[in-house]
């Protein structure tokens, strides 16, 4: 078997990926297929080398339906880490908070240039009162505010992001999960969020002769619409067929298409923090749309 070996000496990086792949793989029947980990150590992992082919619309539809079932496998709460992993994770080169519960903090940090990825505090654990914490508050405080810094955004740009975060925290932009996730939440008291890949841009879906395979996750409890939105950030083959099949298997809430850009704000903010101002106009366009 032809294999690939990934190495990363930074603490916790490999452990997070291995735990995330295993967690997603638990749902791979009937959920989406996941690349297997053949072997791993503290600073490396080995996977089979996957052959790549051009996807057909049929395979894309199969992936959409399977992804709906992966999400419905559930997670305990928004931001939940994969079982067996403790601490914060990463999304590409950016630190990613994985709180025990969403932090009980306000958005004032945004206007003050909240912690940038290079100022993150891994190991700082967060708590809150219940699994019913709102998506908007979580998204504002954990997925937008940490990536605002005075070296990337102007004062006016930070103020606009703060307005978006205020609206998110108010709850006016909250919305339910797709039907299968909501049904899982109603059946099981230990499920409060979707089980998400967390970094599902199109490059992290391998189209193989046997179908779509997920790779390189930032696995976490999240909102299912976040994965669907991420697929569109850089374009995805047969995207509309994926969405249609997903929506057939697990109907999305009213207005889901109008929320795609909102769910893309996280990945765009990370790109601003990591790559600089070239992504700022896109972040500003999203913020203006939803304030």
Functional labels for PLM-detected ranges:
Residues 271-291:
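ATP/Mg2+ or Mg2+-diphosphate-binding catalytic cores
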């Amino acid at each position: 078997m032809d294999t690939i070996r990934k190495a990363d000496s930074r603490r916790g990086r490999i452990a997070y990926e291995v735990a995330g792949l295993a967690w997603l793989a638990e749902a791979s029947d009937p959920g989406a297929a996941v690349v297997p980990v053949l072997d791993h150590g503290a600073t490396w992992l080995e996977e089979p080398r996957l052959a790549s082919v051009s996807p057909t619309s049929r395979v894309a539809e199969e992936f959409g339906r399977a992804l709906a079932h992966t999400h419905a496998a559930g997670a305990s709460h928004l931001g939940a880490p994969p079982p067996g992993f403790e601490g914060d994770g990463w999304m590409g080169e950016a630190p990613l908070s994985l709180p025990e519960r969403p932090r009980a903090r306000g958005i004032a940090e945004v206007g003050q240039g909240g912690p940038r990825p290079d100022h993150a505090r891994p190991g700082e654990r967060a708590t809150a009162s219940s699994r019913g914490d709102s998506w908007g508050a979580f998204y504002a405080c954990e997925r937008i505010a940490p990536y605002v810094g005075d070296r990337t955004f102007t004062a006016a740009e930070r103020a606009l992001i703060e307005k978006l975060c205020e609206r998110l925290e108010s709850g006016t932009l909250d919305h339910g999960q797709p039907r299968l996730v909501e049904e899982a939440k109603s059946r099981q008291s230990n499920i409060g969020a979707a089980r998400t890949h967390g970094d599902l841009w199109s490059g992290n879906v391998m189209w193989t002769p046997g179908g779509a395979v997920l790779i390189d996750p930032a696995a976490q409890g999240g909102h299912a619409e976040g994965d669907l939105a991420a697929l569109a950030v850089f374009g995805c083959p047969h995207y509309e067929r994926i969405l249609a099949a997903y929506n057939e298997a697990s109907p999305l809430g009213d207005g889901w298409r109008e929320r795609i850009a909102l769910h893309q704000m996280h990945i765009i903010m990370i790109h601003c923090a990591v790559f600089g101002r070239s992504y700022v106009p896109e972040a500003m366009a999203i913020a203006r749309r939803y304030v």
